[in-house]
């Protein structure tokens, strides 16, 4: 089974963008479209979709997902988690796009109103314990047991070890990109990730790349 750690996934991302020449915004769009495909193919209640987006590239994916849902006529709310001034350039670009589309960001969203939550707060780049405020928000979302689709990996899960970094959103489905992550098969990561679906978004492997060898038990590939 082809599995990668967080560092290996970042290596693959960098190689695809910097050496192959694939623009990052193309990867973001492909990632977003793959999540839209899963949402459309699943038996989810789509009456009110809440997208939670963070400061990094995972958040950029989430913003693009919200835009695609919005343009398809879905009732979607986008809540940005974190200080916008600290967001990556990819996030700033996606925020500018949604403003031009007329999608207004919600300052605060009520989890109780959402029928589906898309988790795009933190991806494989998470390497610290989540801030206390975010941990509190995650625990509140888990408490009301909403259906969650995680983008690449549930927020709070270490992509290499599967351990929880303070708190983690429990996902019904995780749409992960390129290759499955070791952390989605190990420790509590295998439980909290739910049904894992691997989507090809055009990532390419560096020469002589070697996959991490682990035997997962919850992987679904498409």
Swiss-Prot record:
GO molecular function ontology, one term from the record: NAD(P)HX epimerase activity
SUPFAM superfamilies reported in the protein's UniProt record: YjeF N-terminal domain-like
Cofactor(s) listed: K(+)
Enzyme Commission number(s): 5.1.99.6
Residues reported to bind (6S)-NADPHX: 57-61, 123-129, 152
Substrates-to-products reaction catalysed: (6R)-NADHX = (6S)-NADHX; (6R)-NADPHX = (6S)-NADPHX
GO biological process, one term: P-body assembly
Domain of life: Bacteria
Cofactor: binding comment: Binds 1 potassium ion per subunit.
Keyword NAD on entry: yes
Binding site for K(+): 58, 119, 155
HAMAP family associated with the record: NADHX_epimerase
Protein family per UniProt: Belongs to the NnrE/AIBP family.
Protein name listed in UniProt: NAD(P)H-hydrate epimerase
Species: Leuconostoc citreum (strain KM20)
Lineage, opening ranks: Bacteria, Bacillati, Bacillota, Bacilli, Lactobacillales
Underlying gene: nnrE
